[in-house]
Swiss-Prot record:
Protein name as catalogued: YcgL domain-containing protein PputGB1_4120
SUPFAM superfamilies: YcgL-like
Pfam families given in the database record: YcgL
InterPro entries referenced in this protein's UniProt entry, alphabetically: YcgL-like_sf, YcgL_dom
Boundaries of every YcgL domain copy: 3-87
Higher taxonomy: Bacteria, Pseudomonadati, Pseudomonadota, Gammaproteobacteria, Pseudomonadales
Lineage: superkingdom: Bacteria
The organism of origin for this protein: Pseudomonas putida (strain GB-1)
Length: 97
């Protein structure tokens, strides 16, 4: 079950992406989601299949969401993941003396 999908980047939130079936475009995305997501910016198109690996998403869940609701929203990683990679000096810069 291969799917051709378009992936859109959020202008409001770094690393937030919206997956939709290319044939449907944005028509199945709920109107209430777009104010939160912002005006979708097309990033690229991709052929998805159960065998394909995605960097941060479970391909089975993505395909299931595309079939059932017409879109899949990839949330950005938790802020804790960003903080883990900062040098100790930067983490303590604003600490009171």
């Amino acid at each position: 079950m291969k799917r051709i999908c378009s992936i859109y980047k959020s202008p409001r939130k770094n690393e937030m992406y919206l997956y939709v079936l290319k044939a449907d475009g944005l028509e199945r995305v709920p109107e209430g989601l777009l104010p939160f997501f912002g005006t979708p910016m097309h990033a690229f198109d991709l052929v998805l299949s159960p065998e394909r690996k995605l960097a941060r998403e479970d391909i089975t869940k993505v395909l299931e969401n595309l079939d059932n609701q017409g879109y899949h929203l990839q949330m950005p990683p938790a802020e804790d993941e960003y903080i883990e990679h900062l040098p100790e000096e930067l983490l303590r810069r604003n600490d009171p003396v």
